[in-house]
From Swiss-Prot:
Record's bilayer topology term: Multi-pass membrane protein
Main location: membrane
Transmembrane segments: 21-41, 42-62
Record flagged with keyword Transmembrane helix: yes
Family listed: Belongs to the TrbD family.
InterPro entries: Conjugal_tfr_TrbD, T4SS_VirB3/TrbD/AvhB
GO cellular component assignments: plasma membrane
Protein name according to UniProt: Probable conjugal transfer protein TrbD
Sorted UniProt keywords: Cell membrane, Conjugation, Membrane, Plasmid, Transmembrane, Transmembrane helix
Compartment(s) where it occurs, according to its Swiss-Prot or TrEMBL record: Cell membrane
Length: 99
């Protein structure tokens, strides 16, 4: 019995496999989507003002997304799951309360 316990295998779990997928400190997909929207705004309007506005809006949104990821890196996935389950789990004070 003692021999079986001493011969345990150790498997390393790499940190990259358990970390959330972030880009610039925010959710990767949301940063890329907002960057795409800013680039589309810049190249569709093609003025200096639209370029400045697009860059400023993107920087502000990335800042907000970083604050969101700092509080909970998986907040987007949790919110999407919350929206999908909303019809099934009504917001009540008790699960046994009648509607």
């Amino acid at each position: 019995m003692a021999e079986a316990l001493s011969e345990r295998y150790r498997n390393r779990i790499h940190r990259a496999l358990s970390r959330p997928n972030l880009l610039m400190g925010a959710d990767r997909e949301l940063v890329l989507i907002t960057g795409l929207a800013a680039v589309i705004l810049i190249f569709v309007v093609l003025t200096v003002y639209s370029a400045l506005f697009g860059v400023v809006v993107w920087i502000v949104i990335v800042g907000l997304l970083r604050m969101m990821a700092k509080s909970d890196p998986l907040m987007r996935q949790v919110y999407v799951r919350h929206i999908s389950y909303k019809p099934y789990y009504k917001a009540t004070t008790s699960p046994w309360r009648r509607y």
